[in-house]
């Protein structure tokens, strides 16, 4: 069995790491390079950086941050936010990203996922899916969770896999920042529908929630922000807890 990964997520805006609840109410969590260094030392398997207010004016800022982090941190970095063209993927990879996450542009231009995967390989293309429960299914939202698309999240996941996404970063908007646990039904539905790895995101409040994400949600990796940024738990504690519960992790 492949080791399950623990991935701290750093939401970056204006050069700072922030954390919100349900995609709003952001509070400052610190300097990205310092935080990344700390996670590297604590044994994180990977780091995910999301430029959550990515626009043309701070696009270069995230490149500088990626370069600074990549020069100090030697675990895989996934970077997303504002990726609109294959050239953006190239720039992030050149800056030191190992994987590039595409979210809004995957919806507005699905061909981008295929073109990027064809050029750089599926292993470095992640599609981020922000999903919200609507009636009896989950709908995909874009633009940092502000825009409804009408797309069914499970069908969308299958389409993204078929276009070449090598991993899916799945966030439950209903659970984001609430610390009530992953939306396990959503995670499981998408895990069962595709063969590529699923990173579960949105809602971790306890270490048991991470175990549940893997066990019940069938996630390949669990992503968390608040519980790590504000010192409630350390990455090594999370790994030890998962190991005690029979989940294979890299210690």
UniProtKB/Swiss-Prot annotation:
Name of the protein described by the UniProt record: Imidazole glycerol phosphate synthase subunit HisF
HAMAP family named in the record: HisF
Signal sequence interval, chain numbering: none
The family this protein is said to belong to: Belongs to the HisA/HisF family.
Cross-referenced InterPro entries: Aldolase_TIM (IPR013785), Glycosyl_amidation-assoc_WbuZ (IPR020021), His_biosynth (IPR006062), HisF (IPR004651), IGPS_HisA/HisF (IPR050064), RibuloseP-bd_barrel (IPR011060)
Keyword Lyase: yes
Principal cellular location given in the protein's record: cytoplasm
UniProt lineage: Bacteria, Pseudomonadati, Pseudomonadota, Betaproteobacteria, Nitrosomonadales
Ranges that cross the membrane: none
């Amino acid at each position: 069995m492949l080791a399950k990964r623990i991935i701290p997520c750093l939401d970056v805006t204006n050069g700072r790491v922030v954390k919100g609840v349900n995609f709003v109410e952001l509070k400052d969590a610190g300097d990205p390079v310092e935080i990344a260094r700390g996670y590297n030392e604590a044994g994180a398997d990977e780091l995910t950086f999301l430029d959550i207010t990515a626009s043309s004016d701070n696009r270069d800022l995230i490149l500088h941050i990626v370069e600074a982090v990549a020069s100090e941190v030697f675990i895989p970095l996934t970077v997303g936010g504002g990726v609109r063209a294959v050239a953006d993927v190239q720039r992030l990879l050149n800056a030191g990203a190992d994987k590039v996450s595409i979210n809004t542009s995957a919806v507005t231009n699905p061909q981008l996922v295929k073109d990027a995967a064809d050029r750089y390989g599926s292993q470095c293309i992640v599609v981020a899916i922000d999903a919200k429960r609507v009636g009896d299914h989950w709908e995909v939202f874009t633009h940092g969770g502000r825009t409804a698309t009408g797309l069914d999240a499970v069908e969308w996941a299958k389409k993204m896999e078929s276009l070449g996404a090598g991993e899916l970063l799945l966030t439950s908007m209903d659970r984001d920042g609430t610390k009530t646990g992953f939306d396990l039904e959503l995670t499981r539905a998408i895990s069962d529908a595709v063969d590529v790895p699923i990173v579960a995101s949105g809602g971790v409040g306890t270490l048991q929630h991470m175990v549940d994400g893997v066990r019940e949600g069938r996630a390949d990796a669990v992503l968390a922000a608040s519980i790590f940024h504000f010192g409630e738990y350390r990455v090594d504690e999370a790994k030890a807890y998962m190991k005690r519960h029979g989940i294979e992790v890299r210690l």
